[in-house]
């Protein structure tokens, strides 16, 4: 019985992947790709235009944005590249 209980606990931990940390891209505009581990369950990519051209900001979470800023939020590793 103890073996069965231990097996169920191990299977539950493996299935839930309790130690999983999401990875999001965090480079700005056309910089080389960089990533960061995130505590949040989503990544974002904000895009807007100013006098320098198109600006892209990437990171963890899904922030609120001002009008005129395009926001794309997603929930898989490096989905905001």
UniProtKB/Swiss-Prot annotation:
Entry keyword set: Acetylcholine receptor inhibiting toxin, Disulfide bond, Ion channel impairing toxin, Neurotoxin, Postsynaptic neurotoxin, Secreted, Signal, Toxin
Protein name, UniProt field: Short neurotoxin 1
Reported tissue expression: Expressed by the venom gland.
GO molecular function: acetylcholine receptor inhibitor activity; ion channel regulator activity; toxin activity
Signal peptide: 1-21
Keyword Ribosomal protein among UniProt keywords: no
Disulfide bonding pattern of the chain: 24-43, 38-60, 62-73, 74-79
Coiled-coil residues: none
Superkingdom: Eukaryota
One Pfam family hit: Toxin_cobra-type
One term under GO cellular component: extracellular region
Alphabetical list of SUPFAM superfamilies matching this protein: Snake toxin-like
Record's function text: Binds to muscle nicotinic acetylcholine receptor (nAChR) and inhibit acetylcholine from binding to the receptor, thereby impairing neuromuscular transmission.
Annotated family: Belongs to the three-finger toxin family. Short-chain subfamily. Type I alpha-neurotoxin sub-subfamily.
CDD domains, A to Z: TFP_snake_toxin
InterPro entries: Snake_3FTx, Snake_toxin-like_sf, Snake_toxin_con_site, Toxin_cobra-type
Intracellular or extracellular location(s): Secreted
Keyword field contains Signal: yes
